From Swiss-Prot:
Pfam families: Ribosomal_L10. Its main location: plastid. This protein binds directly to 23S ribosomal RNA. This is Large ribosomal subunit protein uL10c. GO terms for cellular component: chloroplast; ribonucleoprotein complex; ribosome. Residues 1-47 form a transit peptide. It is found in: Plastid, Chloroplast. GO terms for molecular function: rRNA binding. It comes from Nicotiana tabacum (Common tobacco).
């Protein structure tokens, strides 16, 4: 049964009707504001933006892997934005430096030959994409930068080259690969020399032999084009 209306004394001579029912109902009602928006909607928008950015990063990594000869991780913890900008300016045009979360890079390389890079997926990594066969020339700028800035802690965390994983302790093998000029000299020297020299070239590691053959084919193409 609804409570009856009555008046409360006030400092003025006027009195106003007061309903217990309306009072108790209103006391349990949260105030509304015309500009109030549910938080869940904002969270949904932020989540969608975050998901889109992650998808874009994965796609960027996949694009960088096209025509990529070597992919290396660099521990970047502690590096400043200024240092990153300086490092990027010292890299050759065929080498790209990208900062991306390990989980996103792992998603991009899943099911590919680059999946061998899994041991690198620890800590904070920047990723070096080398789009050139001149591997030593691509790695040297960072080594120089590392020594100049005394960044011993920010070393290569690993790399994948021709489907094989190279740990930090194996980078010497990558940094001492023969350059194209050296391959030309080696090939020409073996062809002009005794048969034993040619045999020695053929018996070289498969990786070096492939590079020698590629260089020789390229040389023949260049000579054919100049005629």
């Amino acid at each position: 049964m609804e409570a009856t209306f009555f008046t409360l004394p006030s400092s003025t001579s006027h009195s106003y009707p007061f309903s217990l029912k309306s009072h108790f109902n209103n006391s349990l009602t949260l105030p509304t504001h015309p500009h109030f928006k549910p938080k869940s909607k904002n969270l949904t928008i932020r989540s969608a933006i975050s998901r889109t950015k992650k998808e874009e990063t994965v796609e960027t990594v996949k694009q960088q892997l096209e025509d990529c000869y070597l992919l290396a991780g660099i521990g970047y913890k502690g590096l400043t934005v200024k240092q990153f900008q300086e490092l990027r300016s010292q890299l050759p045009d065929t080498t790209k430096l990208l900062v991306a979360k390990n989980t996103l890079v792992l998603k991009a390389i899943e099911g590919t030959k680059w999946e061998a890079l899994k041991p690198c997926m620890k800590g904070m990594n920047a990723w070096l994409f080398v789009h050139s066969e001149e591997i030593p020339a691509a790695l040297k700028p960072y080594r120089t930068f590392q020594k100049e800035k005394k960044l011993e802690e920010n070393d290569f965390t690993g790399a994948v080259f021709e489907g094989k994983f190279y740990g930090p302790e194996e980078f010497k093998a990558l940094e001492t690969l023969p350059t194209r000029a050296e391959i030309y000299a080696q090939l020409l020297g073996s062809l002009k020399g005794p048969a034993s020299a040619v045999v020695g070239t053929i018996q070289a590691p498969a990786r070096n032999l492939v590079m020698v053959l590629k260089a020789y084919v390229k040389k023949l193409e260049e000579e054919g084009g100049s005629q």
